[in-house]
Amino acid sequence: MHVLRTPDSRFENLEDYPFVAHYLDVTARDTRPLRMHYLDEGPIDGPPIVLLHGEPTWSYLYRTMITPLTDAGNRVLAPDLIGFGRSDKPSRIEDYSYQRHVDWVVSWFEHLNLSDVTLFVQDWGSLIGLRIAAEQPDRVGRLVVANGFLPTAQRRTPPAFYAWRAFARYSPVLPAGRIVSVGTVRRVSSKVRAGYDAPFPDKTYQAGARAFPQLVPTSPADPAIPANRKAWEALGRWEKPFLAIFGARDPILGHADSPLIKHIPGAAGQPHARINASHFIQEDRGPELAERILSWQQALL
């Protein structure tokens, strides 16, 4: 496995990202250790909130949520998935698998001895985070899903997804900043777009971003389906608090909250919402999301 590491100079003077970098080595069951970057802000003994990003972003996506959450006394942790942000980037699409991504994040949880966290997930963060919540329930005490789902290949996949999958794999360029700007309601400035482009100096660094759409299970024959279906069954017994906050203007996942709310017992009576946002809901409504999490957290005390 050939691994790339984005130069630190790419992350200097980013717009609205004053956070300290932390690193640790993570492993999957069949790979050597890789360096994962993460943010760890707020009091070390505060209630832990973990924020998981998705495709093709990194912890930069959470920059407007972190300070309000830490100002309220929470410890906020936001890792960059392997292949993204300041984390190591295996250089081949074939180096990535759904199971490896789950393993890498579980390894990160284990190294930091995290348990009873409030877990906020979006996009691929939900595909990973929902598996972890189901398979290691002691690690997650409260669960928030925003524009996410757990694929079990039991529903029709929208044609638009297959177009996105082909684009991600074969397009000569994969402009992360432009992708984010298309998936938002509000205008994304050139400086912010540059923040999303920062992890990828050139296309050789983008194998992880190109791999993600290929790894979404759409067929019952996909190797991830047995574990995902088992996790879905476990979520059907999840009685801890579950909250769905979705972007009403997300063209693909804007209504994916309904199956989650119906299936997960812990969703009953919670203040679920569809807000004026598109797919990158954190970019559209980051401070509002933070406020909703804090209000929910307070109500659960």
From Swiss-Prot:
Entry coiled-coil feature ranges: none
Catalytic activity: 1-haloalkane + H2O = a halide anion + a primary alcohol + H(+)
SUPFAM superfamilies assigned to the protein according to its UniProt record, in alphabetical order: alpha/beta-Hydrolases (SSF53474)
Keywords noted in UniProt: Hydrolase
InterPro entries: AB_hydrolase_1 (IPR000073), AB_hydrolase_fold (IPR029058), Epox_hydrolase-like (IPR000639), Haloalkane_dehalogenase (IPR051340), Haloalkane_dehalogenase_1 (IPR023489)
Enzyme Commission number: 3.8.1.5
Record field: temperature dependence: Optimum temperature is 50 degrees Celsius.
The AB hydrolase-1 domain, residue ranges: 47-284
Gene Ontology terms, MF aspect: epoxide hydrolase activity; haloalkane dehalogenase activity
pH dependence: Optimum pH is 8.
Keyword Hydrolase: yes
Residue numbers annotated as active site: 123 (nucleophile), 250 (proton donor), 279 (proton acceptor)
Source organism, top-level taxon: Bacteria
Pfam annotation, one family: Abhydrolase_1
Enzyme class at the top of the EC tree: hydrolase
Function statement: Catalyzes hydrolytic cleavage of carbon-halogen bonds in halogenated aliphatic compounds, leading to the formation of the corresponding primary alcohols, halide ions and protons. Has a broad substrate specificity, which includes mono- and di-chlorinated and brominated linear alkanes (up to at least C4). Shows good activity with the priority pollutant 1,2-dichloroethane.
Record family assignment: Belongs to the haloalkane dehalogenase family. Type 1 subfamily.
Subunit field text: Monomer.
NCBIfam families: PRK00870.1
UniProt-recorded name of the protein: Haloalkane dehalogenase
